[in-house]
């Protein structure tokens, strides 16, 4: 045909059999990619430390989605939660990956079958024998089936009636596990961080889909509405489908970037707003103060803090710190976290306890300033030594650690104090192994950041695609000089060659 690359879909325009075939092939490619990508991630994933080296710093993209739906065990005898087990069963990580690859092969065969046997009686009007698809009814069938799937997921899988449940955790991402969920039908069901809303919303949306699908199957649109919305044109279907896809992409970009019950921090990493608000810092401080109120020492209070919680309170795990052109997982930047050194407390020669002001998200460099409990600057690392008044040496600052591997250790050497002051600017202090992955020390983004960027980009492209195809559909007659009042339907809808006076016409 000599078609340009952006017109190649023209070959399936009047061919519903091969139209189905290319969609089957596309689904086969998606399913095959998912299974293959899962196997690749499993080959490089290190499950040895679920606290300091979980899946998100390792750049896992497919595994978190499998995990949140109930897959936690591997045929390699490890579990993402660290629990022990004897038999992972069929639906392990590898089992799900292989199932997707098998499904891909079956879809590939189905695509070939529909490409060969393209001219089915199903696509022809029994009365006239002409090619005809009832697109409003096809829409109803698709809506009904998707509603049934959505309802079944909410009723059976999420609630644990016939399925494992979904990933449930506490607000600070410490106790995550798979468990059944009870639907939330009250006002709390609109809380984006309430897992019960996932069950109730899938049930409600599924029921709505069943009702709407049944309506579109049984009720016929008026002729005026049919013509007005171009319901007989396959490009209307394309435009509407793109609208559904780009809207979904915008929604999931929001739930991923801002955080929600469906994007747990244990699987996708923390959000940037948790760093901006000092979310984990406040919780750690609250726990320490509670321990001190119970009579514990500073060492005991900080020693009770989980390294997993402390690891969230580190700026390198902020997805907004990684640039879009810094490829690779977070571990390629910082390295692999091996230990929490402990909480650093700085003390000047007057006995004031000082803390380092933390770096905001969108700064690459930031002055190292040490403040007392009243927010008064007591020490800093000056840019110009000649003009310094609050340097570490002048103020006589020492550092002492509580909790972690440096518990009760103290340092008074100015160079060492400066080193840990710079580290404290980035949150809790950790020891990283950079040699294993030859990490370069430059921050990377987490899968949360990449998912958001990718889906926002495609949503924007698909938005313009929706406008383009919608405009082509609505204004086709105006642009092509085609009479909109036609009785015969060709090309799934209305089509007439310019100057054709043989097609029957009827005024609406």
UniProtKB/Swiss-Prot annotation:
Q: Check the record and name the SUPFAM superfamilies matching this protein.
A: Photosystem II antenna protein-like
Subcellular localization is given as: Plastid, Chloroplast thylakoid membrane
Look up the domain of life of the source.
Answer: Eukaryota
Name recorded for this polypeptide: Photosystem II CP47 reaction center protein
Instruction: Read off the Pfam families from this record.
Output: PSII
Family, per entry: Belongs to the PsbB/PsbC family. PsbB subfamily.
One CC-aspect GO term: photosystem II
Name the Gene3D superfamilies for this protein.
Photosystem II CP47 reaction center protein
Protease among keywords: no
Gene Ontology MF terms in the entry: chlorophyll binding; electron transporter, transferring electrons within the cyclic electron transport pathway of photosynthesis activity
User: What does the subunit comment say?
Assistant: PSII is composed of 1 copy each of membrane proteins PsbA, PsbB, PsbC, PsbD, PsbE, PsbF, PsbH, PsbI, PsbJ, PsbK, PsbL, PsbM, PsbT, PsbY, PsbZ, Psb30/Ycf12, at least 3 peripheral proteins of the oxygen-evolving complex and a large number of cofactors. It forms dimeric complexes.
Entry keyword annotation includes Repeat: no
Question: How does this protein lie in the membrane?
Answer: Multi-pass membrane protein
Q: Which UniProt keywords apply?
A: Chlorophyll, Chloroplast, Chromophore, Membrane, Photosynthesis, Photosystem II, Plastid, Thylakoid, Transmembrane, Transmembrane helix
Q: InterPro entries recorded for this chain?
A: PS_antenna-like, PS_II_antenna-like_sf, PSII_PsbB
Q: What functional role does this protein have?
A: One of the components of the core complex of photosystem II (PSII). It binds chlorophyll and helps catalyze the primary light-induced photochemical processes of PSII. PSII is a light-driven water:plastoquinone oxidoreductase, using light energy to abstract electrons from H(2)O, generating O(2) and a proton gradient subsequently used for ATP formation.
Entry note: cofactor: Binds multiple chlorophylls. PSII binds additional chlorophylls, carotenoids and specific lipids.
Biological process annotations from GO:
photosynthetic electron transport in photosystem II
